[in-house]
Amino acid sequence: MHTVKLLCVVFSCLCAVAWGSSHVSNRQPCHSPQLTSGTMKVISTGGHDLASGEFNYDSKANKFRFVEDTTHANKTSYMDVLVHFEEGVLYEIDSKNESCKKETLQFRKHLMEIPPDATHESEIYMGSPSITEQGLRVRVWNGKLPELHAHYSLSTTSCGCLPVSGSYYGEKKDLFFSFFGVETEVDDPQVFVPPAYCEGVSFEEAPDDHSFFDLFHD
């Protein structure tokens, strides 16, 4: 398995160069590996746990699957969503009842990929830079989402561009995303394929500013 640690070993020379030039403000956004998976946790800035579960992301096809951990909290329903960002389609899946809700997604930016117009803010060490295996070098990116009257901040590993954390600040809500145990593989590529019972389901109406961030709420 290719973990954050392995990626940092493989790209150690490149990272050393990057660290030495971290003061350069016009650094171009890095690109996520083609496949990533792991655990994603979302909380509100008020400290409320909104969702926690397994994510899978295909950066080449721009497809994302998130299945909430049913043991995470005492809820009556749990999130299982599949998003095809390129096509602008969002599926809300209920595997227990074999039902599916399909919506259009007009706004297609999200926090699994750094937007091309993001600004490189800084490169920092989390933990200790001098003690072996006691630190992680990250790059911080930020930018605006004018269509949503919002702005964001993203942290990725310097070695490999893996997601570490992200913040979204909007008019309706503020969200904080954390990523754990990130791998550069997906166990089952079929997670990006809608279940058969989603076929033929009509699109439900959604507002023009409907976005990935609307999935997470109290």
From Swiss-Prot:
Keyword Transcription part of the UniProt annotation: no
Signal peptide extent: 1-20
Glycosylation sites: N74, N97
Alphabetical list of InterPro entries matching this protein: Ependymin, Ependymin_CS
Short name of one Pfam family: Ependymin
GO molecular function terms listed in the Swiss-Prot or TrEMBL record: calcium ion binding
UniProt entry tagged with the keyword Nuclease: no
Keywords on record: Calcium, Disulfide bond, Glycoprotein, Secreted, Signal
A GO CC annotation given for this chain: extracellular region
Intracellular or extracellular location(s): Secreted
Primary residence: secreted
GO biological process: cell-matrix adhesion
Modifications made to the protein after synthesis: Binds calcium through the terminal sialic acids.
Family that this chain belongs to: Belongs to the ependymin family.
Function, in words: May play a role in neural plasticity. May be involved during axon regeneration.
Subunit text: Forms disulfide-linked dimers.
UniProt-listed PANTHER family: EPENDYMIN-RELATED, MAMMALIAN EPENDYMIN-RELATED PROTEIN 1
Protein name: Ependymin
Organism encoding this protein: Devario aequipinnatus
